[in-house]
Amino acid sequence: MALTLDIVTPEKRVLSVQVDEVRAPGVQGGFGVRLNHEPFMTALEPGRLTYVEGGREHHYAVGGGFLQVADNRVIVLADTAEAAGEIDVDRARKAFEDAQNRLLQLTEQDEGHSAESARVRRAAARLTVAGR
C-alpha cells in the first residue's frame, strides 16, 4: 500500500502518482508525510516539495498553496508547480534578479512589498530545486 499524491495548479493536474513519502515546505516549517499519517491541512510556503517513489526522490518547486492529508492521500493545491528538470534556469535566474531589484526599491510599508517578496521566494525556490 502507498500514498496517493496529487499536485494540482490552477492550470492543470500536474501529477498523480503512488509514493512512499512526501516532504513539503509548510508555513510553520518543513514536514514529511508517510503511510497512515494523521489527517491535517496546512498552507505551503514557496519551496521544494519532494516525493519518494520506489526509493527514488523526485523534486518539484512549488510557489505556495495548500496541502491536505487524509486517508493515505496527499492533495497539493499549488499556486505553481514545476518538476526540477522542467525549470528554465535562465528564466528563473532573471525572475529572481528582477524581483530582488524591485524589492530593494520598496520598504516593508510600501504597497506591493509582500507580493514582490513572494516573487523573490518563488524564484529562489525554482533555482534551488533546479540545483543552481
Swiss-Prot record:
InterPro entries: ATP_synth_F1_dsu/esu, ATP_synth_F1_dsu/esu_N, ATP_synth_F1_esu_C, ATPsynth_dsu/esu_N. GO terms for cellular component: plasma membrane; proton-transporting ATP synthase complex. The keyword Transport applies. GO terms for molecular function: ATP binding; proton-transporting ATP synthase activity, rotational mechanism. It is found in: Cell inner membrane. It comes from the Bacteria. Keywords: ATP synthesis, Cell inner membrane, Cell membrane, CF(1), Hydrogen ion transport, Ion transport, Membrane, Transport. It is a peripheral membrane protein. CDD domains: F1-ATPase_delta. Its main location: membrane. NCBIfam families: ATP_synt_epsi, PRK13446.1. Belongs to the ATPase epsilon chain family. F-type ATPases have 2 components, CF(1) - the catalytic core - and CF(0) - the membrane proton channel. CF(1) has five subunits: alpha(3), beta(3), gamma(1), delta(1), epsilon(1). CF(0) has three main subunits: a, b and c. Produces ATP from ADP in the presence of a proton gradient across the membrane. This is ATP synthase epsilon chain. It comes from Anaeromyxobacter dehalogenans (strain 2CP-C). The gene is atpC.
